Amino acid sequence: AKDGYLVSKSTGCKYECFWLGKNEGCDKECKAPNQGGGYGYCHAFACWCENLPESTPTYPIPGKSCGKK
């Protein structure tokens, strides 16, 4: 397992959040079936996820820079 920032596969962007620390939205995203993580919270205004499967992509995705050229 690994820890990391959740990332949108289509854009390469982190999942933004504003409620730092315990964050229901991040936790829900982290535990979603397509992510498969164990616990999510908001760190530095992005969703950080623990105990992700190695197969789940985390930020940054090589070649996708979240809108930056």
UniProtKB/Swiss-Prot annotation:
Question: Does the record carry Disulfide bond as a key word?
Answer: yes
Q: Give one GO molecular function term.
A: sodium channel inhibitor activity
* Domain spans labelled LCN-type CS-alpha/beta: 2-67
Could you say which residues form the signal peptide? 1
* Biological processes per GO annotation: defense response
The cysteines covalently paired via disulfide bonds are: C13-C66, C17-C42, C26-C47, C30-C49
Q: In which tissues is it expressed?
A: Expressed by the venom gland.
List the Gene3D superfamilies hit by this protein, alphabetically: Knottin, scorpion toxin-like (3.30.30.10)
What SMART domains does this protein map onto? Knot1
Q: Which positions are listed as propeptide?
A: 67-69
Q: Supply the Pfam families for this chain.
A: Toxin_3 (PF00537)
Identify the keywords attached in UniProt to this record, alphabetized.
Amidation, Disulfide bond, Ion channel impairing toxin, Neurotoxin, Secreted, Signal, Toxin, Voltage-gated sodium channel impairing toxin
Residues modified as Cysteine amide: C66
- A cellular component term (GO) from this record? extracellular region
Q: Give the principal location in a single coarse category.
A: secreted
Compartment(s) of residence: Secreted
Protein task = Beta toxins bind voltage-independently at site-4 of sodium channels (Nav) and shift the voltage of activation toward more negative potentials thereby affecting sodium channel activation and promoting spontaneous and repetitive firing.
Q: Which comment does the entry carry about domains?
A: Has the structural arrangement of an alpha-helix connected to antiparallel beta-sheets by disulfide bonds (CS-alpha/beta).
Per the similarity annotation, which family is this? Belongs to the long (4 C-C) scorpion toxin superfamily. Sodium channel inhibitor family. Beta subfamily.
**What is the recorded name of this protein?**
Neurotoxin Cex5
Source species: Centruroides exilicauda
